[in-house]
């Protein structure tokens, strides 16, 4: 099986073209491949398929390192756009890619940066999904030894965003692993810890559902900016710089009724071949 290794700000992916080769995976095989000592190693596996809709260019299936399938990955989708250009699967500058729940328009800006229309953020708790009797801008979650005040939103996948004073001091792995599996999130959630630097700049650390803390997460950056704007902490209509451990993303949102836009890099590392 041929594959490519890529990363978006250190959030690393194995990308597989299933258009020109036949591939099959189960969760055990994905977990084996994701192992950084005995496999290839990756945060997520991205499988590029032919489109199921004539108005779409490519379909993408997304698997976490634990073998679970998810339906959104902002950093991964940028890498897929770069991948299909590198592999000459398209010559388009504007590429529409679908997942099982979402479709996104991506624009190749130059040899490094990709712009993504991430769609509208969803705050309705039923659609996130999040167990709550009513919509609120902020929710309280109780976990052992902590009371957490957070915002929740879907960017095609569920996100929980927690405002903190010093993000570098947060026990991300401890809190993230507890909150990811909180009973209020029936499909689990990505957990983000956001520090406001200014109205157009934040620092962010992310515990990704099924993967643990990662260097960067595009949909989490979008979720954090959406929550920040919703709370009046960040400005609308400008590019908000999101500082992640792996690098920076730039997110803009006009407000309710409008899509989020993300700009970030997508970096090719190498090609390889492995026997399954």
UniProtKB/Swiss-Prot annotation:
It holds the Pfam family DAP_epimerase. The record marks 159, 208 as: Could be important to modulate the pK values of the two catalytic cysteine residues. InterPro entries: DAP_epimerase_AS (IPR018510), DAP_epimerase_DapF (IPR001653). Its main location: cytoplasm. It is an enzyme of class 5 (isomerase). Its EC number is 5.1.1.7. It catalyses: (2S,6S)-2,6-diaminopimelate = meso-2,6-diaminopimelate. The record marks 270 as: Important for dimerization. It is found in: Cytoplasm. The active site is at 73 (proton donor), 217 (proton acceptor). GO terms for cellular component: cytosol. Keywords: Amino-acid biosynthesis, Cytoplasm, Isomerase, Lysine biosynthesis. Pathway: Amino-acid biosynthesis; L-lysine biosynthesis via DAP pathway; DL-2,6-diaminopimelate from LL-2,6-diaminopimelate: step 1/1. SUPFAM superfamilies: Diaminopimelate epimerase-like. Substrate binds at residues 11, 44, 64, 74-75, 157, 190, 208-209, 218-219. Gene3D superfamilies: Diaminopimelate Epimerase, Chain A, domain 1 (3.10.310.10). One of its GO terms (biological process) is lysine biosynthetic process via diaminopimelate. PROSITE patterns: DAP_EPIMERASE (PS01326). GO terms for molecular function: diaminopimelate epimerase activity. PANTHER family: DIAMINOPIMELATE EPIMERASE, DIAMINOPIMELATE EPIMERASE, CHLOROPLASTIC. Catalyzes the stereoinversion of LL-2,6-diaminopimelate (L,L-DAP) to meso-diaminopimelate (meso-DAP), a precursor of L-lysine and an essential component of the bacterial peptidoglycan. Homodimer. Belongs to the diaminopimelate epimerase family. This is Diaminopimelate epimerase. The lineage of its organism: Bacteria, Pseudomonadati, Pseudomonadota, Gammaproteobacteria, Enterobacterales.
């Amino acid at each position: 099986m041929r594959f490519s290794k890529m990363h978006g700000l250190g959030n690393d992916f194995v990308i597989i073209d299933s258009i020109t080769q036949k591939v099959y995976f189960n969760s055990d095989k994905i977990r084996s491949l994701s192992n950084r000592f005995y496999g290839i190693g990756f945060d997520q596996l991205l499988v590029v398929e032919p489109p199921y809709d004539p108005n779409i260019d490519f379909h993408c299936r997304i698997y976490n390192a634990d073998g679970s399938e998810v339906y959104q990955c902002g950093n991964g989708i940028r890498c897929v756009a770069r991948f299909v250009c590198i592999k000459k699967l398209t010559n388009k500058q504007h590429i529409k890619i679908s997942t099982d729940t979402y479709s996104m328009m991506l624009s190749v800006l130059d040899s490094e940066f990709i712009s993504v229309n991430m769609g509208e953020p969803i705050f309705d708790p039923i659609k996130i999904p999040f167990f709550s009797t009513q919509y609120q801008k902020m929710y309280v979650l109780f976990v052992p030894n902590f009371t957490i005040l957070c915002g929740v939103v879907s960017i095609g996948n569920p996100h929980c965003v927690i405002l903190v004073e010093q993000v570098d001091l947060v026990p991300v792995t401890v809190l993230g692993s507890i909150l990811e599996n909180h009973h209020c999130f029936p499909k689990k959630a990505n957990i983000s810890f956001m520090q406001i630097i200014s109205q157009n700049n934040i620092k962010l650390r992310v515990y990704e559902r099924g993967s643990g803390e990662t260097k960067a997460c595009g949909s989490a950056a979008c979720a954090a900016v959406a929550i920040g704007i919703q709370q009046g902490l960040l400005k609308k209509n400008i590019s908000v710089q999101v500082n992640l451990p792996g690098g920076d993303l730039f997110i803009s949102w006009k407000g309710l009724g409008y899509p989020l836009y993300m700009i970030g890099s997508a970096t090719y590392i190498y090609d390889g071949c492995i026997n399954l």
